[in-house]
Amino acid sequence: MKKYLLFLVLSVALLPASVWGQANLSQIDSLIKRMLPEASEVGISVYDLTAKKSLYTYRDTKLSRPASTMKLLTAITALSRPDADNPFRTEVWHDGVIEHDTLQGNLYVVGGFDPEFDSLMMDSLIEEVITFPFSVINGQVYGDVSMKDSLYWGHGWAWDDTPEAYQPYMSPLMFCKGAVEVTVVPGSLQGDTASVSCKPVSSYYTLTNRTKTHTPSAGKYSLSRDWLTNGNNLIVTGNVPTFRKDLINIYDSGSFFMHTFLERLRAKGIVVPESYGFTELPSDGAEQMARWETPVQKVLNQLMKESDNLNAEAMLCRIASQATGKKRVTAEDGIVEIMKLVRNLGHDPKDYKIADGCGLSNYNYLSPALLVDFLKYAYSQSDVFQKLYKSLPVLPDHHKKMLNN
């Protein structure tokens, strides 16, 4: 629903004047009265970017929960920065020395909050690591998650939205968006246990399969995990009449990354410690071994086209890190930068409430007028607009027909 809300706002906000000129704009008022449920509220702002004039407003300063339209403010603020094109980085470093096929030192994986870091990228990073002349690590393997604070959810996020994948446990070390894709295929005979497979493959989680094929008495299909105790036993139960594919989040993302990283190093023949830890990369005496970079445009496209909450929060964290230059940044550090742009566009930040970067929080309150002013600003800045425009969702043909009618 939030994805479609963002899509609808962009469709209305960016329509050219020629489209609106075909209809009597004054009829929108009667349409609002006729279509909206009694006692409901709406705010509308329609602006012609080419002619630089407002075409229609209706309570455009009214505050409402923006849902995923909040992503516009986060994306535009991020793109407005002079360092906007810097990629998202995940790095591997080591200290100590390499002697006789052994690393006499520690390995560090430094997270840069890359929300697109997936299984193939993990393999690529490991392939770089194993080019170094050692097969034994006589030290520790650490994850460095010091980029942000330890809060894994945004302010105002609902605790019982977990284990939905749209609310992942955030960390500077994200792996496959902190989620597992579960594919379920019914068996050939009624009553058979369905086939269940998971991606990415990792021993970090376990699986319990209590499904039955074409068996309504088995109950409604369900995918969950023991999330109240932060467990990662994926539990698949109930009737499976047809093929299905679902996502479920995993607790917690940094540990999911590091566990899988060690597991795959072992699979490549590297002798590693039994466990991992978390600490900061030393300020000196360390050498970089490997690095993966994800372009900002890729992160932005997923953010806007798919209304990806994780990508929006990664952008917010990145804004905070770039603006402050410090470690352990908070969401508030990023929100301060968004509010600076709000003020620069002629609005009073005290008139609005921003709690996160993606709009998942129920504490956010924005207005149509503010959203349109952000779009106007983006349009006026060619560097910002070109990147933002590429990332916007494309109107499907059947929706175009609906608008034309």
Regions found by a protein language model. Give the residues of each.
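A general secondary-structure junction signal
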Residues: 46-48, 94-96, 143-147, 280, ...
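Conserved serine DD-peptidase/penicillin-binding transpeptidase domain
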Residues: 30, 81-349
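Buried hydrophobic packing segments
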Residues: 74-79, 261, 315, 371-375
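Beta-lactamase-like hydrolase cores
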Residues: 21-62, 88, 123, 127-132
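Short active-site loop at a secondary-structure junction
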Residues: 57-77, 81
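Bacterial Sec-dependent N-terminal signal peptides
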Residues: 1-27
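Small-residue-rich helix-loop
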Residues: 34, 55-57, 306, 316-405
